[in-house]
A protein has these predicted regions:
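PDZ domains, with a preference for the canonical peptide-binding region formed by the helix
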Residues: 20-45
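Conserved PDZ fold ligand-binding element
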Residues: 4, 9-27
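Conserved Radical SAM active-site core
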Residues: 50-52, 58-172, 176-200, 210-236
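Terminal peptide-recognition signature
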Residues: 15-18, 44, 82
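Flexible glycine/acidic-rich beta-alpha junction loops that bind and position SAM and/or redox cofactors
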Residues: 145, 180-181, 201-225, 244-267, ...
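PDZ/PDZ-like peptide-tail recognition elements
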Residues: 1-8, 34-35, 45-47, 53-69
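Structural preference for beta-strand elements that scaffold enzyme active sites
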Residues: 132-134, 170-172, 203-205, 248-250, ...
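Radical SAM enzyme core and accessory elements
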Residues: 260-410
Length: 410
């Protein structure tokens, strides 16, 4: 059952329980959406103050109700490399919630561990067609996975994946490479095991473990390990292209940057199945830069701030704009922000605090008409990860698309 938060129907009081639609039991908002969309709703069963009541609708009448915010499942694991576990105090409150809920995986692409999933959940996922899902696998070795997740249920990963696939669910997997733990021989085995579940496993993303100054027990992926991992994964990628007509396994951009190797061409990424996981973002950015042409003159002086990881690509954008003569030399600067909040091992733009941006801007001797911040550095409310805001009318948070960014500058 699910509670109605608001109703425009006089016959349905607020805070009423919604029990069923057309005799289909409703357990949460997903079932409400599923059955309300797929059927021509004629009747619902509600309960208010212990009294059940059936409400009948006319053929052309729509249900005008809003449901209460659902309660999502929390993670039951205790991974040493968990970014949320290592967060300091004083950040945005929502950042501290460790979700591990298949509904959020389906709705917004959050990765889940499958350690809290039941047979009923799997059947329900199949019935509601909640596909695709995103799963953090890391390793298919049951003993090692139990140790990594510190959860006795973690060893059932291959069984859970197979059951979901049997219920016609497609899955995108993630492997976090932890030096000395999930790399090398173990990575080889994990990719091999997951590939046996193709096409149910649609893609495998391989990403380096994140390390901050608040998480000291995990070693960073070195340049040498990045190079070895690229060699291993690209062999699988070539093999899968021949066998399955798709690369299937893809490396995070960070591996190539760490290794000092070129970013693969767009064909490598196929339809970019794990773009939001930092896999293929650099290539799309590079191609957008190359596609820039006939850009109108940009007047004024601009500063683009970024994390160290993206610095080479934004410098490439600067050179392109100067080459097109749409901006005068010296009128645009690109600067990497040192991440003092999490430590300089954190180089992605989305994890730069408001305090670090303020510190960097205050040190700039040159005067700028516009200061461009990365698109991922604030939430929808304009707040940085440290819950701060910046009041400076020169600041523009960059759009994700380069052409839209250029429009902001003109």
């Amino acid at each position: 059952m699910v509670r109605i938060a608001y109703s425009r129907e006089k016959k349905i009081p607020n805070s009423t329980l919604l029990l069923s639609i057309n005799d289909q039991k409703i357990d949460d908002f997903l079932e409400y959406q599923f059955y309300n969309d797929m059927t021509n709703t004629r009747k619902i069963l509600i309960e208010n103050k212990g009294v059940k009541k059936e409400v009948v609708f006319e053929p052309d009448e729509k249900i005008a109700i809003e449901l209460e915010e659902p309660v999502y499942r929390q993670c039951e694991n205790d991974c040493d490399f968990c970014f949320i576990n290592g967060l300091p105090k004083g950040l945005r409150k929502k950042l501290y919630f460790r979700d591990d809920d298949y509904r959020l995986s389906f709705l917004i692409g959050n990765f889940l561990s499958l350690t809290n999933i039941s047979k009923y959940d799997i059947q329900r996922i199949g019935r509601l067609k909640l596909s695709p899902l995103y799963v953090s696998v890391h390793t298919t070795d049951p003993k090692l996975r139990r140790r990594i997740f510190k959860n006795d249920k973690a060893g059932l990963i291959m069984q859970h994946l197979s059951s979901l696939i049997d219920n016609n669910i497609n899955i995108h997997c993630q492997i976090v490479v932890i030096p000395g733990v999930t790399d090398g021989v173990n990575l080889f085995k994990t990719i091999t095991d997951l590939s046996t579940l193709y096409p149910g496993i649609s893609s495998i993303g391989v990403v380096p473990v994140g390390k901050t100054k608040h998480i000291n027990s995990i070693p960073m992926v070195s340049r040498k390990l990045a190079q070895k991992t690229i060699s291993l994964v690209e062999e699988f990628h070539k093999k899968f292209r021949k066998k399955y007509k798709t690369g299937m396994v893809y490396l995070a951009d960070e591996f190539y940057i760490k290794a000092g190797l070129p970013i693969p061409e767009a064909q490598y990424y196929g339809d970019f199945p794990q773009y939001e996981n930092g896999i293929g973002m650099a290539r799309k950015f590079i191609n957008e830069i190359k596609a820039l042409n006939n850009t109108k003159k940009i007047k004024g002086k601009f500063l683009i701030l970024t994390g160290r990881l993206a610095l080479p690509f934004l410098e490439q954008l600067k050179r392109r704009l100067e080459k097109l003569r749409c901006i005068e030399n010296g009128n645009i600067d690109v600067l990497a922000v040192d991440n003092l909040f999490f430590g300089n091992s954190v180089t992605v733009s989305g994890l730069i605090s408001g305090a670090d941006f303020v510190r960097t801007i205050s040190k700039c001797e040159k005067k700028y008409d516009r200061i461009i911040l990365p698109p991922t550095c604030v939430n929808d409310s304009g707040r940085f990860i440290d819950d701060k805001t910046i009041n400076d009318n020169r600041i523009i948070v960059s759009p994700h698309n380069i052409k839209e960014l250029i429009k902001c500058l003109q």
